[in-house]
């Protein structure tokens, strides 16, 4: 069997890892052995936080809706219950956006909810 020299593949692999580690501080960005570990850890964090991001944004939307609803005399849970009873199917992301950027539209939704809760 012929001898296999791995200079080309090794260099390519090193270049790929170091490119992924670009911007890392210190030896994490320019020493292959350390950069490889840093890139693996960064990938783990990225995987974990793509899932965490969904939870964090949902919490943010609920906090914004709650604050806006309380200004108009309802708690978040009362507001959510009223939305369900009034058959208003707007998701939390859109409600939070309305609460921040279009107070009048959010206020009209709250009035519909209050009317439905009073019945």
From Swiss-Prot:
Keyword hit for Lyase: no
Record GO biological process: ribosomal large subunit assembly; translation
PROSITE patterns (alphabetical): RIBOSOMAL_L20 (PS00937)
GO MF annotations, alphabetized: rRNA binding; structural constituent of ribosome
A GO term from the CC aspect: ribosome
Family that this chain belongs to: Belongs to the bacterial ribosomal protein bL20 family.
Stated name of the protein: Large ribosomal subunit protein bL20
Gene that this polypeptide is encoded by: rplT
């Amino acid at each position: 069997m012929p001898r296999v020299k791995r200079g080309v593949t090794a260099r390519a692999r090193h270049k790929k890892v170091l490119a992924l580690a670009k911007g890392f501080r210190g030896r994490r960005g320019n020493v292959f052995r350390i950069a490889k570990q840093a890139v693996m850890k960064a990938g783990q964090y990225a995987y974990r936080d793509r899932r965490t991001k969904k939870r964090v944004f949902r919490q943010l939307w609920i906090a914004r809706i709650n604050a806006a609803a309380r200004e108009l005399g309802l708690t978040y849970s009362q507001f959510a219950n009223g939305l369900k009873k009034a058959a208003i199917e707007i998701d939390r992301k859109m409600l939070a956006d309305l609460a921040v950027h279009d107070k009048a539209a959010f206020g009209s939704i709250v009035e519909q909810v209050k009317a439905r809760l009073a019945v």
